[in-house]
């Protein structure tokens, strides 16, 4: 079955007083909007927070402000009968190492779940959509697939409660191949240790191959490329490679 959902935040805006940091807005009138969306058939919603890594950021204020907004959104969703997708994204932009990404992702997830619990969000009724723990795009030393899977799994195990039923990764600017490979390796190595299901909620990493193959005119090639990439990611959620199935 296919269920309809809707993005309900109004975007990430400049956080006043905090240079180069953003806060996601959209809480005003959200209760009424969610009730309307549910009547129209929506069964889940999405709210994205973005966290930037640089020498002096993210600040505690940015992390807490975004976590607070995510928690209030999630609480209102559950009140309205919608499943909230909780998306705290630590951006890949920057020169930071994978170790720095791990430390920041840990802070973000810990704060998000503190706020979710404070606002009495039922963790069994959410989907977490986090970033993977990965090197910054400008980092001269790019972590390999094994390192990414190891540190991402470690970060999740330390900070995501077992009550959460599912984790659907965002791709966040990874290549299509790497996004699939990272998901595959985590499910290959750690599936017997995980209390939650690991799956994907990719945008660019799912669509890029299809857009290149389509090239504005070749509909059949685009469809085949999309199907192939979707199958590869689907297999990866079960710890299986499409090429060895």
PLM region spans:
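Short beta-strand segments at enzyme active-site cores
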Residues: 44-49, 81-91, 121-131
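Active-site capping/gating regions of soluble enzymes
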Residues: 96-245
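Glycine-rich anion/phosphate-binding loops
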Residues: 19-33, 58-73, 106-107
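Active-site cofactor/substrate anionic-group-binding motifs, chiefly glycine-
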Residues: 1-41
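Hydrophobic alpha-helical segments and helix pairs
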Residues: 39-50, 66, 70
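Acidic (Asp/Glu)-rich catalytic clusters
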Residues: 1-5, 34-42, 75-79, 118-121, ...
């Amino acid at each position: 079955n296919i269920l309809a959902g809707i993005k309900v935040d109004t975007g990430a805006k400049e956080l006043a007083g905090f240079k180069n940091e953003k806060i996601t807005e959209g809480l005003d009138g959200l209760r009424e909007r969610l009730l309307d969306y549910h009547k129209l058939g929506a069964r889940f919603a999405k709210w994205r927070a973005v966290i930037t890594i640089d020498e002096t950021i993210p600040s505690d204020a940015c992390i807490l402000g975004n976590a607070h907004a995510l928690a209030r959104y999630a609480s209102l969703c559950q009140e309205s009968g919608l499943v909230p997708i909780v998306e705290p994204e630590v951006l890949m932009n920057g020169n930071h190492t994978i170790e720095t990404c791990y430390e920041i992702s840990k802070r973000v997830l810990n704060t998000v779940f503190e706020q979710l619990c404070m606002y009495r969000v039922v963790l069994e009724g959410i989907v977490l959509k986090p970033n993977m723990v990965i090197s910054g795009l400008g980092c001269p030393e790019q972590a390999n697939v094994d390192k990414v899977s190891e540190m991402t799994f470690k970060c999740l195990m330390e900070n995501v409660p077992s009550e959460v039923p599912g984790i659907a990764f965002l791709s966040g600017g990874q290549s299509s191949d790497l996004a699939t490979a990272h998901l595959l390796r985590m499910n290959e190595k750690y599936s017997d240790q995980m209390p939650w299901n690991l799956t994907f909620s990719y945008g660019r990493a799912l669509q890029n191959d299809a857009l290149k193959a389509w090239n504005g005119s070749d509909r059949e090639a685009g469809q085949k490329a999309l199907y192939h990439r979707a199958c590869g990611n689907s297999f990866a959620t079960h710890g299986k490679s499409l090429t060895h199935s």
